[in-house]
Structure formats: C-alpha cells, structure tokens
Amino acid sequence: MTIPRIPRQLYGIIGYPLGHSMSPLLHNWGFELLGEQAAYMAFPVAPEKLAEFICCARMLPVSGLSVTIPHKQAVMPLLDAVTPRAQAAGAVNTLFYDDGKLTGDNTDVYGFLHPLDSCGTAHAAALVLGAGGAANAVLAALTARGMCNVTVTNRNGDRARILAERFGVRCVAWEERHAVDADLVVNTTPLGMAGDRQAQTPLDPAFFSSRPAGLAYDLIYNPAQTFFLASAQAAGWRVLNGLDMFVAQGAEQFRIWRGRELPFAQARALIADALASGC
C-alpha cells in the first residue's frame, strides 16, 4: 500500500497514546482502493495540547479527524457545532467541516450496534463498565433501542453517576459491580488493551460462571481476545470483540468525509489480518 506523495486532502486521528490504532491502515487502504487523493496520519496529542492542536488544525489543510481516548468529550467545547447524534451520545469521535464549521459527529453508536444487531437476540439487562466517551455512545445506543434495565459502573463514581443521570439508567459503585444481574456486559474501559494493561480485566471470571450465559462485548479489538472475553467464553457466554465496531465506525467516518462506502468484509479482513500478524 502506498500513500500519495502530495495528497489533496489530509485526515488523521488524535488521541494519546496512539500506538494501538489501526485507523491509519483502514483509511489509507480505503483511499487507495477507491482512488482518492488523500492521506491519513496519526497525531499523538497529549490532553494539555488538545486546544492548541485544534487551533492549528483549523489553519492547516486538514479535512477531517478521528478522535479517540482521551479526547472524545474534551474536544466538544473546541468545536463550532456538533451533530444531533453526537449531542445525544455526549461524545465526539469524528470531526469534519460542514459549510466551513468544524463539526463533531459520533459514529461509535452506529459502530456499536452493527455487530450487536447481527447477533439477533434481545437482552433483558445490561451492565456497562466504564464512563468515558465510548460508554456514552454505548448508553446512547442501548437507551435508543428501548432497553430499560441498564446499569453503569466506573472506578470514578462521580463520572458514573453523571452518566447514569444523563441517560436515566442505574449506577452502582465499582466495588458492587459483580452483584449486578445482566445478560449483556459491555467493557468500555481500556483494561485488557494491548500494552501495559493487556493482563488486566474489569470483571472477575467468577462473574460469568455464577449466572446464566449471555453476551460479553469488549470494545477492545487489540488483542482480539482479552482476558475479559476469555473468561466469559470459558463460562459458556457468547463473545464479541471490538473489531466489527471499529470497522463499522471507521467506514461511517469514511462515508462522512468522502461520501463513499468502504466494502465492509474487505475492510474487516484487512484489519483482522494486520492484528493477527502483529502489525
């Protein structure tokens, strides 16, 4: 795969750190596949540099940006506008220009539901682990689908309570999470992500073995099987990792930026192969 030497349009991802991101591979592959004269780069931006970066990006030929941890909420007041779905989610993961206005959107809700809808089963109760930008998108998706029995928990109890009040769901202390009855458990935390946190998990394995099997959904896609998912699968639970969500939300970003559709199956295979090879 080659990147154009002089791209007509520049895109990128901002977050900190960014070592695990597959977004440059996905979007540059899409540009090449569809003959787009554009390029996508990684921009590691520390939290204290976010406002300065956004200011600089406005003056540079940057046509759009992906936004990841820890900037999904912090970036919102720095924008000219946000879309209704980003407003509903309370977080932004996509920046684009709309009539000259730097606008924030959220494709995580779409991405989260894409594989969940494919499962074809309804769930009675959900436990959402974490209270960051991804958790906002998950709660927006679940409540939009009419799911009433939803519980959120986070190490920072204040953040969880604010999130629970925003979406009208239940909140429990992090120390009480193992007592929650749920047949859908979603990990939105970075616990288990490749790197220093790979050996960590947000739930004790006993959680899964002590209740009827349901669905464990980890938004992490690298590694493909976290300790969280391995524990659930060992107890007979169905599992989903974050690969399909990642590809779906990225394809939706591509559509927003370029007005064209990425072939989902090919994009998924690209990322899966890259992860398997350790790229």
UniProtKB/Swiss-Prot annotation:
Q: Which reaction does it catalyse?
A: shikimate + NADP(+) = 3-dehydroshikimate + NADPH + H(+)
> Catalytic residues per the record?
K72 (proton acceptor)
Q: Which UniProt keywords apply?
A: Amino-acid biosynthesis, Aromatic amino acid biosynthesis, NADP, Oxidoreductase
Does the record carry Amino-acid biosynthesis as a key word? yes
Pfam families assigned to the protein according to its UniProt record, in alphabetical order: SDH_C (PF18317), Shikimate_DH (PF01488), Shikimate_dh_N (PF08501)
Pathways per UniProt = Metabolic intermediate biosynthesis; chorismate biosynthesis; chorismate from D-erythrose 4-phosphate and phosphoenolpyruvate: step 4/7
| Subunit field text | Homodimer.
Q: What is this protein called?
A: Shikimate dehydrogenase (NADP(+))
